[in-house]
Amino acid sequence: MCYIRPTESGVFKIEDCTWNTKTPFASIRRIVQDRKEIFRIRPGLWALEEYRSLLADRGIVAQDVTNSDSVQVQEFNHSYYQGLLLYIGNMKKLETYVPAQDKNRRCINVKLGEISTLTEVPPFSYQEFVNRSSTIDVMWFQPNSLGNEVMMPDSFFEVEHSTDIQNSLCKFSDLQSFNAQMFIVADARRHDEFIAKLNHDYFKPISDRVKFVSYDKLDRYYEGLMTQQKSSLVL
């Protein structure tokens, strides 16, 4: 199986081959866009055309106007971008958490529970707050030398492909007392909807704290971190 996707272990591992360019991801992106035998699954994620049907049987499908609202696409997007957020948090040396009900979902071929570093939400406050946060799609926590018991949340992320953004904003509102960043991750086409919901009077206390991150922007950020980590990319 061939996925064209930068990971922490590299891209296309081939012995005795070095990628001698300062912009490997831009070069890869240009190459795959010009090759008919390669198709785009998501921003930054490509595969060989000959595996399209096999990948679809495994729930990995290319999104287009005909299937963007299908259950298969929704489930894939949700777990895929949860996975990216976990990988990013790990690269930033933060502790990462994904809800218990999502641990067996996969980001391509890796279970989310195998990417996250925490198996339980750290007891950072009263149990009611801990319980409320436990269903947030991805959380990052600041490591603490004193142990998990005093670990505080760094960032909250909710991935919203087609579900109601307002539900996520309600979670953030309930957790506004904590000095954590708050993000809605979604298709760029939902930005106007995000602004409209956030402008509701109920969410005024958090209106300056919640940020919108598009799928494309998240992918570019991931690639940027990978570029910083590797002065040269081994293929």
Residue ranges, per PLM feature:
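Hydrophobic, Leu/Ile/Phe/Ala-enriched alpha-helical segments that form helix-helix packing faces
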Residues: 15, 32, 85-93, 198-202
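Nuclease catalytic cores
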Residues: 57-106, 128
